Amino acid sequence: MMDLKTKAFDISQNFTISLDGPAASGKGTIGLMLAKKFSLKYFQSSIVYRQLTFDCISQKIDITDIDAVIALSKRLKLDNNLDLENENIGDIASQIAVISEVRNNLNKYLINLVKTTPRIIMEGRDIGTVVAPDADLKIFITANPDIRAERRYKQLQAKGKACILDEILQQIILRDKRDKERKVAPLLPASDALIIDTSKLSAIEVVEEITHYMQIIK
């Protein structure tokens, strides 16, 4: 039996990676690097929640109107031309994500995407536990909240977006609380996931650690 690294490099093989972790833990950068390294499609599951949030705002649907939000989640269509990387949208999306019916509806979309995409790395909060429990490789990325807030602050500044570091930190702490305490698919690593704390590691070092792990797992 071939090791995971060999299988991942073989583009004739189906290969799925689940990449979970809290906000601003470095998942995006690491996910893109792994996708490029192994020629995988990269998909952020948070996009479906951000799209739903954008749709609620544009259609003037109050997120406290649970029935309306649930109904909208059943007919989600992604618009790849939108810029959904907005802290306000992200904060509202994390509130919508705790609605169990919404999460179930959007997870159906994500599960179908994984099943119909032969080679994919999907990033999110519950990919390894719910969306792709049979993934070839499951990774859980974490980091200190202060480090994560600083990373997000620098990302937003680089994009020319106004932001305040302390506000970002408070949003991250609140999002962590919501993610960990929600009744449906709370944020936690799969029992067989590789867990990496990126607080003191560069993205390159993390990818190297993952690649080494893949060499010894079959």
Swiss-Prot record:
Keywords assigned: ATP-binding, Cytoplasm, Kinase, Nucleotide-binding, Transferase
KW DNA damage (keyword) present: no
InterPro entries documented for this protein: Cytidylate_kin, Cytidylate_kinase_dom, P-loop_NTPase
UniProt GO BP: pyrimidine nucleotide metabolic process
Enzyme class of the recorded protein, top EC level: transferase
A GO molecular-function descriptor: CMP kinase activity
Protein's UniProt keywords contain Protein biosynthesis: no
Protein name: Cytidylate kinase
Annotated source species: Rickettsia canadensis (strain McKiel)
Name of the encoding gene: cmk
